[in-house]
Amino acid sequence: MFIENFKVESPNVKYTDHEIHSVYDYETTELVHENRNGTYQWIVKPKTVKYEFKTDVHVPKLGVMLVGWGGNNGSTLTGGVIANREGICWATKDTVQQANYFGSLTQASAIRVGSYNGEEIYAPFKSILPMVNPDDIVFGGWDISDMNLADAMARARVFDIDLQKQLRPYMESMVPLPGIYDPDFIAANQGSRANNVIKGTKKEQMLQIIKDIREFKEKNKVDRVVVLWTANTERYSNVIVGLNDTVESLLASLDKNEAEISPSTLYAIACVLENIPFINGSPQNTFVPGLIDLAIRRNCLIGGDDFKSGQTKMKSVLVDFLVGAGIKPTSIVSYNHLGNNDGMNLSAPQTFRSKEISKSNVVDDMVSSNVFFMGLVNTRPRWIKYVPYVAIERAMDEYTSEIFMGGKSTIVLHNTCEDSLLAAPIILDLVLLAELSTRIQLKAEGEGKFHSFHPVATILSYLTKAPLVPPGTPVVNALSKQRAMLENILRACVGLAPENNMILEYK
């Protein structure tokens, strides 16, 4: 059974006109390795920590600025939100299609809230806490191409022609602001698009981004802005002592116009200085150590890296299943070919390397959770090939595992990925959850004052391929754990226990 919304009635939660306040007992464990009767033993001690959460219920008018707004993802997301807002239907060769948000965690998934008369009751994910309605988002952004969004949508060839025709009047007037272009960081084949670029030194470019954000906010009368990178994958930046390893060195390098500061890092610096949440949707190392330190000092949300949309999402599910079932993965071989602009940019070795690194650690935490399998998975080789005729990505994976008594099992997956149709709802979720997390404050027992989440937003890790985490924090890639973490944190904000699936009342 499905219900549209709900309200929690409990001594641990209080709703007011301004906030939701909850008290939550966080049940965890503490491990100690100590001498007991002459031998060292691992002792697990259950531990309860009392937390308080308060969530601002005022939903702001949200502006979303996309870096690479005129790319496939940017034009697809913008058109998709307009189609949903306007209730557009269009004809395909098979049917009359209605706009939807399938693929969005916040807009198209559900959570279990309990049972009623022996039936499981579910509610929309977006009903847990007040969230921005996608229909109300104001879009803007930058692109190194000056093509308007209607023409960019046609160039992307993602939407059906009938839908494009209906969207064109809404999107023709949308033109990206000039973007930062540095040919040293992306493939040379992108140069033909670069007719809309910000001139000047790197610091001047960064200051122009700040000016653009302020003008966008003022022009559109938005309360809050979130910036997200959905532009080309850059090559990895060199992390060098004295260049970008500390806040001071990074800002000094900016003053000196050091060549090794990437465009994505310039956008991120601008956002952090303006206290604007910034999310990196590509695999490069935008968040060099000095930038992470700057975000922490200024308590500005940053998140990334790389959208987890198709092939990698499947991998984070399948390997979790294999390891959890006691099956020993021994080899994962992956191959992609695609013909869109993403594939063309990734055809350059230096940008491909960023994607390779992003994909390389996806299974590490799952394999290391089982002592029998540690260090046994070979996840190479992997290839990404640019095939112009094939617009839609094809992903092929072969998983080889060892099973009972020396047997071998092979699983082969072929995944045809509509990349931008998978990525667009993920972008939507990222900006909505980033905005929501800025309205949540918490404090643990013994802490005097409420504070926000850590600026490095692990709460977004379900949506990213290589989750950015605070220093010293374990990286979790298993999709089910990431989903449970996100849902259970939001449940805690309304005083609900985590969903543990025990269902003891029926045992």
From Swiss-Prot:
GO biological process, one term: phospholipid biosynthetic process
GO MF assignments: inositol-3-phosphate synthase activity
Cofactor requirements of the protein: NAD(+)
Protein localization: Cytoplasm, Cytosol; Nucleus
Pathways per UniProt: Polyol metabolism; myo-inositol biosynthesis; myo-inositol from D-glucose 6-phosphate: step 1/2
Function: Key enzyme in myo-inositol biosynthesis pathway that catalyzes the conversion of glucose 6-phosphate to 1-myo-inositol 1-phosphate in a NAD-dependent manner.
Protein name in UniProt: Inositol-3-phosphate synthase
Species this protein is from: Citrus paradisi (Grapefruit)
